[in-house]
């Protein structure tokens, strides 16, 4: 039976995910077999496991830090927002349907057996499970049916560490208010408090720690187990997208990602963001586009609505103008579908109807009732056009999409089909599943998420852009992505280990609740 520790926060973006990532790495370094767990995650960023199930990317990152393969057991419930008041509900990696917030609130208690099955399976396989909460445990309007904070802590019988974010101010009020709003039995489960994202001299903070403990003493005896400094590490974070959207400065190689209103899987571009002389700018206005070397249309949770946004905002016309000047255009998943000629929604998956695409690729898309979920790998074959240097490069990634794309007219296979996994295509029925296609010049599209994570592919694309501009490739690119990620996990672990009382945390895990 595994020991457990749970990280809960005073609010969203308090740093729970990164602290779980850090603890997974620290415990791995200390010789333990450790797994992350989050009963319910809400995110548009998702991942497909080897066995074809969909899960949140935060737990994928945490699994990487722990040195294990991600499993849907680590995130049994994933909510992917479709509107301001509704989400697609994914349970054990498979779609259960779309629900409004009120309907899901009534339904979620029925998912407790599935949550416990996942947790208990991990419990048998690992030494330690590091559990992540969501938002705040003190959302008193939601507590009655809680399955992700104190409700989960009770189910797992897990001691809790409560994290407050000092960077946004009011950390003592955050911590005091959260503890005060909890029930007595819930307070008893909190075994330590952590202040996160601190800048400055800890000695100046220490009187406040003592005063807060004194103020809490009538209702709870909870020690501080650490003050974690504001640490700059380059690790995927679900809540970091707003910071990424602020980047507007063009560099030697400039890549513009269209900031669609319902953008999903923006982690597809993480590898491209690594290089000091490459800018990845997220733009939502024509005035922000400038003259990039590459334009990427990303994935989206609603392709049709976001295509309408593209059209109404004037970005479609701007993209077509850039294409006429031979700018490299690349679409992923929903962005790939937009680059085609027509999109049809006969089953009302995205609201019904049909809409004309940008007509830059010879495909039509029909939205189906069933979602495609799978990993994919192979070798690129006979890539045409500007990125012909990708021929022979290996690829690996995953697909998550509702649409099925077909050739819109008779096309030359060698000109448009770049992937060599022939079992994934059915030319007799004119369908395309996981193929990278081009217009034979400088427009490309794929259903494959994670394609830029492959070092050979990323290197070739940046190298091609450098060559077009007469820039020395070595000035821009010198990088091993996998090694870099490992270094970042170690850097995070070092910073957190040195600032937490790990001896006390091991004692908390040993004693339990």
UniProtKB/Swiss-Prot annotation:
Domain GATase cobBQ-type: 252-457
Gene Ontology BP annotations: cobalamin biosynthetic process
A Pfam cross-reference name: CbiA
Active site, renumbered: 333 (nucleophile), 449
UniProt keywords, alphabetically: Cobalamin biosynthesis, Glutamine amidotransferase
Role according to the record: Catalyzes amidations at positions B, D, E, and G on adenosylcobyrinic A,C-diamide. NH(2) groups are provided by glutamine, and one molecule of ATP is hydrogenolyzed for each amidation.
Family according to the record: Belongs to the CobB/CobQ family. CobQ subfamily.
Descriptive protein name: Cobyric acid synthase
Organism: Lachnoclostridium phytofermentans (strain ATCC 700394 / DSM 18823 / ISDg) (Clostridium phytofermentans)
Classification of source organism: Bacteria, Bacillati, Bacillota, Clostridia, Lachnospirales
Gene label: cobQ
């Amino acid at each position: 039976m595994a020991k457990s520790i749970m990280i809960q926060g005073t609010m969203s973006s308090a740093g729970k995910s990164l602290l779980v990532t850090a603890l997974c790495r620290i415990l791995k370094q200390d010789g333990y077999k450790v797994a992350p767990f989050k009963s319910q995650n809400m995110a548009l960023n998702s991942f497909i496991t080897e066995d074809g199930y969909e899960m949140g990317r935060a737990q994928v990152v945490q699994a990487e830090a722990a040195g294990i393969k991600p499993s849907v057991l680590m995130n049994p419930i994933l909510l992917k927002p479709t509107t301001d008041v509704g989400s697609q509900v994914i349970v054990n990696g498979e779609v259960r349907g779309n629900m409004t917030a009120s309907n899901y609130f009534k339904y979620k208690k029925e998912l407790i057996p599935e949550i416990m099955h996942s947790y208990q399976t991990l419990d048998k396989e690992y030494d330690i499970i590091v559990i992540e909460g969501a938002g705040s445990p003190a959302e008193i309007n939601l507590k009655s049916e809680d399955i992700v904070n104190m409700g989960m802590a009770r189910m797992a019988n897990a001691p809790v560490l409560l994290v407050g974010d000092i960077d946004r101010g009011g950390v003592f009020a955050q911590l005091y208010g959260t503890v005060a709003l909890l029930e007595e039995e819930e307070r008893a489960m909190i075994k330590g408090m952590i202040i996160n994202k601190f800048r400055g001299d800890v000695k100046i903070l220490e009187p406040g720690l003592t005063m807060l403990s004194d103020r809490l003493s009538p209702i709870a005896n909870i020690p501080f187990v650490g003050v974690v400094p504001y640490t700059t590490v380059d690790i995927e974070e679900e809540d970091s997208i707003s910071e990424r959207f602020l980047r507007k400065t063009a560099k030697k190689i400039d890549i513009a990602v269209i900031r669609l209103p319902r953008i999903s899987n923006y982690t597809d571009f993480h590898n491209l963001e690594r290089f000091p002389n490459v800018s990845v700018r997220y733009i939502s206005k024509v005035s922000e586009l400038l003259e990039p070397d590459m334009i990427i249309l990303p994935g989206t949770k609603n392709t049709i609505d976001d295509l309408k946004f593209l059209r109404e905002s004037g970005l479609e016309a701007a993209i077509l103008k850039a294409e006429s000047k031979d700018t490299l255009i690349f679409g992923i998943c929903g962005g790939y579908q937009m680059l085609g000629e027509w999109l049809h929604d006969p089953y009302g998956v995205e609201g019904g109807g049909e809409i004309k695409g940008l007509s830059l690729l010879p495909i039509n898309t029909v939205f189906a009732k069933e979602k495609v979920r799978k990993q994919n790998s192979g070798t690129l074959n006979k890539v045409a056009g500007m990125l012909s240097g990708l021929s022979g490069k290996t690829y690996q990634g995953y697909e998550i999409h509702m649409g099925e794309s077909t050739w819109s007219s008779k096309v030359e296979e060698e000109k448009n089909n770049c992937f060599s996994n022939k079992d994934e295509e059915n030319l007799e029925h004119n369908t395309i599943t996981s193929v990278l296609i081009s217009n034979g010049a400088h427009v490309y599209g794929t259903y494959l998420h994670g394609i830029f994570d492959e070092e050979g592919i990323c290197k070739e694309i940046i190298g091609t852009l450098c060559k077009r501009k007469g820039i020395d490739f070595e000035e821009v690119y010198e990088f091993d992505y996998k090694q870099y990620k490992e270094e970042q996990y170690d850097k995070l672990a070092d910073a957190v280990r040195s600032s937490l009382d790990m001896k006390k945390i091991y004692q908390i895990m040993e004693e339990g609740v």
